[in-house]
């Protein structure tokens, strides 16, 4: 219970993966919109 490092690392990794997921969804949305509007 006196080891905040692993918990902090886990939260940081989760936040990073969430940002990568949002970026991937954004890129896919842009590519699909370009495909449909052309």
Curated annotation (Swiss-Prot):
Chief place where the protein resides: plastid
Transmembrane found in the keyword field: yes
GO cellular component: photosystem II reaction center; plastid membrane; thylakoid membrane
InterPro entries: PSII_PsbL, PSII_PsbL_sf
Keywords carried by this UniProt record: Membrane, Photosynthesis, Photosystem II, Plastid, Reaction center, Transmembrane, Transmembrane helix
One Pfam family per UniProt: PsbL
Cell compartments where the protein resides: Plastid membrane
Membrane-spanning residues: 17-37
Topological relation to the membrane, as annotated: Single-pass membrane protein
Stored NCBIfam families: PRK00753.1 (NF001972)
Role according to the record: One of the components of the core complex of photosystem II (PSII). PSII is a light-driven water:plastoquinone oxidoreductase that uses light energy to abstract electrons from H(2)O, generating O(2) and a proton gradient subsequently used for ATP formation. It consists of a core antenna complex that captures photons, and an electron transfer chain that converts photonic excitation into a charge separation. This subunit is found at the monomer-monomer interface and is required for correct PSII assembly and/or dimerization.
Record's subunit section: PSII is composed of 1 copy each of membrane proteins PsbA, PsbB, PsbC, PsbD, PsbE, PsbF, PsbH, PsbI, PsbJ, PsbK, PsbL, PsbM, PsbT, PsbX, PsbY, PsbZ, Psb30/Ycf12, at least 3 peripheral proteins of the oxygen-evolving complex and a large number of cofactors. It forms dimeric complexes.
Family (UniProt): Belongs to the PsbL family.
Official protein name in the record: Photosystem II reaction center protein L
Organism (species): Aneura mirabilis (Parasitic liverwort)
Lineage: Eukaryota, Viridiplantae, Streptophyta, Embryophyta, Marchantiophyta
Gene name of the record: psbL
